[in-house]
Curated annotation (Swiss-Prot):
GO BP terms, alphabetized: cell division
Signal peptide: none
Record's protein name: Transcriptional activator POG1
Keyword Transcription regulation among record annotations: yes
Length: 426
């Protein structure tokens, strides 16, 4: 008995292999199609994602008719929203135009400017906020600090060498000194104590010279009619020396030539410039700040030695400009004058001051001073400002004692300390 073995059929095996290969190919194709579908989504998927539905899982179950109807409804709703927005904008625009028409300040130029702003393309990127907010502007420049950034004003200063600045300063100081010295020389009056000492003369010659001075001043200050018309004055003229007669004749001729000056101007010395006074009077005369006349007299015509004196009227009007012993000497000379001449001089001064309503300076009871000077003296003569022996200088502008002009020979000094109990004069 032998065993029987079944051998597989060659045809059947080949068929099985072909079927398996075909199945594998189909599976691969299906997978590739799925991948292609996933990589290339359909238009439906794209629209649904754009609307905001997200990734739809049941897209295959949605039919095309339903999808198309949904899209139509969505588009219609958006169109209505746009129409409503247009209508509201038109209403607002009509209200704005109406207000602009009613407003007088709104002109065509402003309308054109608004249209230009709307038409410009570069303004489309600008978005205005609905509510105005206060924002801090950022500065483009770096922060200014004293350590890092220098000061602009210090950079604008012109730089120069030190020696140039010193030279310019010295020149300015010299110019100022020259100007002040020139002004002081013009304003300062001559000092009666700056001349060399006078040679001593006999008492009789001094009395004669003083009488000549008094008569000469009386002829210059009294009216022309009373001076040159009376016989007494003519008799007095014959008693003077020859030099005084010639001087008086020259003065009389110049006064007659310059007849425009009034009688009061001749007496008071007002409205008289330096040029005019030098033409009318001889070179010995000059005008004081009080309006009176002073004379510089030479004792002899041959030897002109400087002997500066003043009239009795000017002496009594300005008692503070002379030392005490000077008044005593002049009072002694007045007492020793001829009684007839002294009486005639006193009558002339009384009549002259009665004519102009002034006090008689010849009287020993009163000393005539201007109003402003008397007030100043009243303020200065305070019991704690000056002692009884001092002679204050009226209207002394310089506070330094070195710069003040020495008007008196003896200058007393008082050292006063003002306290709350004794305050300074006001």
């Amino acid at each position: 008995m032998g065993s029987s073995t079944t051998e597989p059929d060659v045809g059947t095996t080949s068929n099985i292999e072909t079927t398996t290969t075909l199945q594998n190919k189909n599976v691969n194709e299906v997978d590739q199609n799925k991948k292609s579908e996933q990589s290339n989504p359909s238009f439906k998927e794209v629209v649904l994602k754009d609307i905001g539905l997200g990734e739809a899982t049941d897209l295959e179950n949605v039919s095309d008719d339903v999808f198309n109807n949904y899209l139509a409804i969505r588009l219609e709703r958006e169109r209505k929203e746009i129409e409503l927005l247009k209508e509201s904008n038109l209403e607002k625009l009509s209200v704005i135009i109406k207000n602009c028409i009613e407003c007088n300040s709104f002109t065509d130029e402003t309308m054109k400017r608004l249209i230009n702003l709307v038409d410009n393309n570069y303004n489309n990127s600008v978005h205005f906020s609905p509510k105005s907010k206060r924002r801090k502007l950022e500065s483009t420049s770096p922060p200014m600090s004293s350590s890092s950034v220098p000061n602009k004003e210090t950079n604008n200063i012109q730089q120069s060498n030190s020696y140039q600045l010193r030279n310019n300063y010295d020149e300015e100081q010299e110019n100022q000194k020259s100007q002040t010295q020139g002004s002081k020389s013009l304003l300062s009056r001559p000092n009666i104590y700056s001349f060399p000492p006078k040679q001593t003369q006999p008492a009789s010659q001094q009395h004669v010279q003083l009488a000549a001075i008094v008569q000469r001043q009386s002829t210059l200050t009294t009216p022309l009619s009373s001076t040159y018309g009376s016989n007494s004055n003519n008799s007095m003229n014959t008693q003077l020396p020859l030099s005084d007669k010639s001087l008086r004749s020259n003065v009389q001729e110049k006064i007659v030539q310059q007849g425009s000056m009034s009688q009061r101007d001749i007496i008071n010395g007002s409205n008289m410039s330096s040029q005019y006074s030098s033409q009318v009077y001889p070179p010995g005369y000059y005008q004081t700040r009080y309006g009176q006349q002073m004379v510089v007299v030479y004792p002899d015509s041959d030897s002109p030695q400087i002997n500066q004196t003043s009239t009795i009227q000017h002496q009594q009007q300005l008692p503070h400009t002379y030392p005490p012993h000077y008044h005593q000497q002049q009072q002694l000379h007045q007492n020793q004058l001829v009684p007839q001449q002294h009486q005639q001089l006193q009558q002339q001064s009384i009549s002259k001051h009665q004519l102009f309503g002034q006090k008689n300076p010849m009287s020993p009871q009163s000393h005539y001073l201007p109003n402003n000077e008397s007030q100043n003296l009243g303020v200065i003569n305070h019991r704690r400002s000056f002692s009884s022996g001092t002679y204050p200088v009226v209207n002394s502008r310089s506070k330094s004692p070195d710069r003040s002009m020495p008007l008196t020979v003896q200058k007393q000094m008082n050292f006063l300390i003002h306290t709350p109990k004794h305050p300074p004069p006001t």
